[in-house]
Amino acid sequence: MESWPWPSGGAWLLVPARALLQLLRADLRLGRPLLAALALLAALDWLCQRLLPPLAALAVLAATGWIVLSRLARPQRLPVATRAVLITGCDSGFGNATAKKLDTMGFTVLATVLDLNSPGALELRACCSSRLKLLQMDLTKPGDISRVLEFTKVHTPSTGLWGLVNNAGQNIFVADAELCPVATFRTCMEVNFFGALEMTKGLLPLLRRSSGRIVTVSSPAGDMPFPCLAAYGTSKAALALLMGNFSCELLPWGVKVSIIQPACFKTESVKDVHQWEERKQQLLATLPQELLQAYGEDYIEHLNGQFLHSLSQALPDLSPVVDAITDALLAAQPLRRYYPGHGLGLIYFIHYYLPEGLRQRFLQSFFISPYVPRALQAGQPGLTSARDIAQDQGPRPDPSPTAQ
């Protein structure tokens, strides 16, 4: 097909014009992303000249250039000014790191901790400004929640509270849902769901007054059935759905709601191998004899070993999560969901677009290898993998994959 240079020229006039305007407003991120975008446009230009009519080529090039430059625009940020933010779960991990960053940015930070004498609390007291206030709170105790809510109402400016960061969370046991006591599910719901619900409802009058932000740290375990995280994942699923409701209902008030879905990061609780060993022993000590005989102690040992191995590969740098929380608090148009960390795109793609059998097999191989309980083993001593049992049984008449 005949080459048409004028669509190319028209598009390359429009794109640099917008880029120049963004540069003048300091609204364009420079560096490798910009170079990659220009290379993409050049390749697309070459294809359009050879494959499309002139008007179609101009439309495709101009639209692509406009979209690319929009994605490269620096997100507009609101000034910190005298904004106040309350963060739960600041003893360690994401909450602790976020409290320190927001304090350095000039926020008034109300940081709740489980223990005022914990290492994380002492660190915050030592390194942060006098604007940061430490508040003791256990989300399973209504009295603690009421005290923090009352303190916040008294000590926030007349404009109200700008942001609430629901960060506190808990995971207790790593085991099949049948092996976890019902009390474990209740505890996870109390901390991860009902605690966040009470804090959000209690602070909504202040947040509505300021047209502020609600930022909630959830988990991919609430979106997909990771093996052996049923209690934790169920509570996070309920939490994410609740925040979706708040997002719709608070829209007329100007309150924006964001959910953070981080990958696995190396927080203090993740690194605490002794804690996971203690919880495993606690589970074994309280497990009914019938379940212990059916599953076997070696099965639970294996699950915890695999879980600790997966945690050893956790991401050490917490800044992507802290940056996501900060953006949700200050961006003029924050995202509804943030996915900080590597590998989440692939996991969500598999979860949403592949057949259910493949999804379940992937989650098992990604997180915990499919070893079988003692009662299902084929008579061999020790652990036997599901693959070994399948080989012993010979080929099945139905070759279609089944979920483990």
UniProtKB/Swiss-Prot annotation:
Lineage, opening ranks: Eukaryota, Metazoa, Chordata, Craniata, Vertebrata
Quaternary data: Interacts with ligand-free cytoplasmic NR3C2.
Major location category of this protein: other
Function: Catalyzes the conversion of biologically active 11beta-hydroxyglucocorticoids (11beta-hydroxysteroid) such as cortisol, to inactive 11-ketoglucocorticoids (11-oxosteroid) such as cortisone, in the presence of NAD(+). Functions as a dehydrogenase (oxidase), thereby decreasing the concentration of active glucocorticoids, thus protecting the nonselective mineralocorticoid receptor from occupation by glucocorticoids. Affinity towards corticosterone is higher than cortisol or dexamethasone.
Keyword Oxidoreductase annotated: yes
Pathway(s) of this molecule: Steroid metabolism
Tissue: Highly expressed in kidney, adrenal and colon; detected at lower levels on lung, liver, and spleen. Expressed in oocytes. Expressed in uterine tissues and in corpora lutea.
Subcellular location: Microsome; Endoplasmic reticulum
Region feature Disordered, mapped onto this chain: 383-404
MF terms (GO), sorted A to Z: 11-beta-hydroxysteroid dehydrogenase (NAD+) activity
GO CC terms, sorted: endoplasmic reticulum; intracellular membrane-bounded organelle
Enzyme Commission number: 1.1.1.-
Active site: Y232
Catalytic activity: an 11beta-hydroxysteroid + NAD(+) = an 11-oxosteroid + NADH + H(+); corticosterone + NAD(+) = 11-dehydrocorticosterone + NADH + H(+); cortisol + NAD(+) = cortisone + NADH + H(+); 11beta,17beta-dihydroxyandrost-4-ene-3-one + NAD(+) = 17beta-hydroxyandrost-4-ene-3,11-dione + NADH + H(+)
Regulation: Inhibited by glycyrrhetinic acid, carbenoloxone, 11-alpha-OH-progesterone and 11-beta-OH-progesterone.
Protein name, per record: 11-beta-hydroxysteroid dehydrogenase type 2
Ligand binding (NAD(+)): 82-111
Listed GO biological process terms: glucocorticoid metabolic process
Top-level class of the enzyme under EC nomenclature: oxidoreductase
Record's keyword terms, sorted: Endoplasmic reticulum, Lipid metabolism, Microsome, NAD, Oxidoreductase, Steroid metabolism
